From Swiss-Prot:
Protein name per Swiss-Prot or TrEMBL: ATP synthase epsilon chain
The UniProt record lists the keyword Transport: yes
Gene name in the database record: atpC
UniProt KW keywords: ATP synthesis, Cell inner membrane, Cell membrane, CF(1), Hydrogen ion transport, Ion transport, Membrane, Transport
Taxonomic placement: Bacteria, Pseudomonadati, Pseudomonadota, Betaproteobacteria, Nitrosomonadales
Keyword match DNA repair: no
Length: 141
C-alpha cells in the first residue's frame, strides 16, 4: 500500500506544485474533499478556497489558494487544474482586504443582476484568499 500520491497543481499561468503528498484537502463544490493515497477515482469541480497539501517525507503542510477549477484523482496521481492558483505565502493580504471591501460595497449598492453576480464571485475569491492567509499563519506559528 503506497503511503504517498503524486500531486500536480497547475493554473493557466504556471505549474504551482508537483510532488509527492501524504494527504490533500480540496474545496469541492459540495464540501471539502480529503484525499489519501489509494483513494477511489474521482472528478469534481472545485470552488474558491484553500488547497491543503501535506507534503511527503515529513514536509510541512502547504496552503495554496485556488479560485476554482477541476480536481481529478486517478490511481497514484491527483491533478488540480485551477483557474488561478497562488501559493499561500505569495498572497497579498492588503489587496485581498481591498478586494473584499470593494465587493461588499458593490453588493451594498444593489448592483444589477450581472454586476451582483460578479460582486458575489469577487467577494467569494477575496474571502478564500484571506482564509488561505489565515491558515498559513496557523501552520507557521
Amino acid at each position: 500500500m503506497a503511503s504517498t500520491i503524486h500531486l500536480d497543481v497547475v493554473s493557466a499561468e504556471e505549474s504551482i506544485f508537483s510532488g509527492e503528498a501524504e494527504f490533500v484537502a480540496a474545496p469541492a463544490k459540495l464540501g471539502e474533499v480529503g484525499i489519501y493515497p489509494n483513494h477511489a477515482p474521482l472528478i469534481t469541480t472545485i470552488k474558491p478556497g484553500v488547497l491543503r497539501v501535506k507534503v511527503a517525507n515529513g514536509g510541512e503542510e502547504q496552503a495554496i489558494y485556488i479560485s476554482g477549477g477541476l480536481l481529478e484523482v486517478q490511481p497514484g496521481v491527483i491533478t488540480v487544474l485551477a483557474d488561478t492558483a497562488i501559493r499561500g505565502h505569495d498572497l497579498d493580504e492588503v489587496k485581498a482586504i481591498e478586494a473584499k471591501r470593494a465587493a461588499e460595497e458593490a453588493l451594498r449598492n444593489n448592483a444589477s443582476g450581472v454586476d451582483y453576480a460578479r460582486a458575489q464571485a469577487e467577494l467569494s475569491e477575496a474571502l478564500a484568499q484571506l482564509q488561505t492567509i489565515e491558515q498559513l499563519r496557523k501552520t507557521t506559528h
